[in-house]
Every structure is written in C-alpha cells, then in structure tokens.
Amino acid sequence: ASALMKNFNISAEEAYGLIATGAQNGADKNGDLLDTLNEYSAQFAALGLSADQFMGSLVEGADAGLFSIDKVADAVKEFNIRAKDGSDSSAEAFKGLGLNSDKMFAAFAAGGETAQAAFFDTVEALNKLEDPLKRNEIGVALFGSQFEDLEAGILPVLGDIETAAYDGAAALQQINDV
C-alpha cells in the first residue's frame, strides 16, 4: 500500500481499497499482486497514469487471460524507459507509428498529463497498425520482450487503461462489513 500512497499521492484507505478491488477482480490469481504494485507503481505514475488506471490494467490483464499481471506492468515499465531514452530504435518506432519522435520524447520527459496523452496516442497508433509483423516489431521496440511474450493480448489491455476506474472505497467497505 505504501508504494501506491507514495507514487500516486493517495490515502491509505484508497490504497487498501484498490488492493482489495484488484484481489476481488482476479489480479492476484498468481499471487503476485502486491509485488507488482510495489515494483511498478513508480513507472505508471511517471507516465501520468493514476492508481485506478494502474490497477485497471492489472485487472484487465488478468481478465484477458494474460500469462501474468507482472508482464503487463513490466511492459509499461519498459515503455517508460524506452519512451525517454532518445535512442534511434525508439525514435524509429515512434516514426513507424506516424508520430514525431522529438515531440514524443519531450512529452514523456515532461510526465503528468502530457505523458499520459502521449502514451495513449502511442497505444492507439499501435492498435491501428494493420500489418501484424510491423505492429509486433514496433511493439517490441517500445515495450520490450514483454510485448512479444504477451503478443496481441496486451494491446486491448493497454488501450483500456485510459477508462479503467475501480471503486476501491466500495471494495474496502465490503470487507469492513464482513
């Protein structure tokens, strides 16, 4: 809970509510929810994503039957690193999506809502690629080997992060009522 509180500036009640919600919705099916939250919350926060969106991506990944929620979070971590590294391979990947790499690097370096908007622009552009080989090549260039491991299953999960919202307070109240 402390990693959620620190990285997303939320209360203990909100953090525990999100943990309860995630567990109730299948995100702990492999027993790695708490480790995943601790390890990757800073990466999601750096992209301007909320704690709700972080948990939503994990629940969506579990719902989609992806191998492990850790892989979903690790793909976002790899993206966060590559989206800021200024490397030729990242620049080429952004260009392959029809995005201006200099603007994308600047947006991710800025963080917050600017990074969040750039993240969703990237995911949307990747989702629109019709050529599966090109989509995989660019996906791996930006999200690392986790993209390859999760294949096309990760794209709907990443695309749904934007609208993910889980009522952690309601989940915590249900636990308290028992």
Language-model segment annotations:
Residues 2-5, 9-178:
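Amphipathic/coiled-coil alpha-helical interface segments used
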